[in-house]
Amino acid sequence: MTITRRDFINAGVTAAAGAALTPTLLHGDSALPTPSRAARPIVVSSANGLRGVKVAYDKIVAREDTLDAIIAGVNIQELDPEDQSVGLGGLPNEEGVVQLDASCMHGPTKRAGAVGCLEDIATPSLVAKAVMDYTDHIMLVGPDAKRFAVNMGFKTQNLLTEKSRQDWLRWKARLNKGDNWLDHDDDVRIKFTHGTINMNAVNAAGDISSVTTTSGRAWKVAGRVGDSPIVGAGEYCDNEVGAAGSTGRGEANIKVCGAFLAVEFMRQGKSPQEAVMQVIQRVIAMTEKRLLDPNGRPLFDLEFYALTKDGRYAGASCYEGGKFAVCDDKGARLEDCGFMYKRDQRPKMP
């Protein structure tokens, strides 16, 4: 039988339409889970969000939108000059410039927004939400992200606090023994952070949101963007399933799209704990040899946090000792992360 070009194209269109209408093709042999209402409102965050989860939870109980609530929660850290991992006072890049990244996702509307390499604006999470609310785009970066923020009414300020500037100068002095910078304060330990805050929430109606915000890796190459502003890596939510996010070495997470992967594992029926632990296994499997010790263990840490539509939650890290923040009707608290390796198996971190 001879097949014409038109027959071939029509057959392809028909097959594509059929595939689009068959959700089981995306999930192996199992059908999509039946959506359920949340058992209770709950907020889950990285450990540095302990104050923020309480703020977010109270707003959710007061029937505020889940995304507005968790952004208000992370704003606490963004505006705290003593927190050197996000926002105002965040540790700068190698040029001494604070560059911020953030992304957010709103489950009920299936919308998202993000900014990367944003300078002089202390609350990148709010700018990311403005990108979501007022544009047809998802991500804006660099000077144009700042221009957008200023046009939207955000106020500029110098984000480099004196404390962070002094840490940067100490790092710069010790960078190269043969340079022209004199070393001082030998007894002062220089911080080297991958600091970030991720927060996820579900309300009593089962609506879910997620946000991640960061100043990124301390002393990074100017222009570096990690996983935080990448929807599907630094954070992700699906209103029918749950949400997930991460903190730690962003480069390791980007390669596995960790937040998306965790949500997909939960869609398949895995518990939040099983999902985030399986993501960490995938991260380690995808790690290049130079970042592994002789026993195949990572020379970095990475944490994931996840919750489901019905209010189950978990946190996980590569090594024992990690904590994450939770708030529900029992109050705000820190809980232990699940882990891949025990504390005494941790190699010396670079």
Residue ranges and their predicted role:
Residues 45-49, 59-67, 226-272:
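Active-site- and interface-proximal helix/loop "cap" or "latch" segments in soluble metabolic
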Residues 100, 110-191, 280-315, 320-326, ...:
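C-terminal binding/interaction regions
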Residues 40, 51-59, 66-136, 140-147:
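Active-site-adjacent structural elements in enzyme catalytic domains
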Residues 88, 101-104, 197-202, 208-210, ...:
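Short beta-strand scaffold segments in enzyme catalytic cores
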Residues 1-16:
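N-terminal secretory signal peptides and thylakoid transit peptides that target proteins
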Residues 249-296, 303:
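Extended C-terminal subregions enriched in glycine
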Residues 147-150, 154-241:
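Glycine-rich anion/phosphate-binding loop at the beta-strand->alpha-helix junction
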Residues 23-54:
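C-terminal segment of N-terminal export signals and the immediately downstream linker at the start
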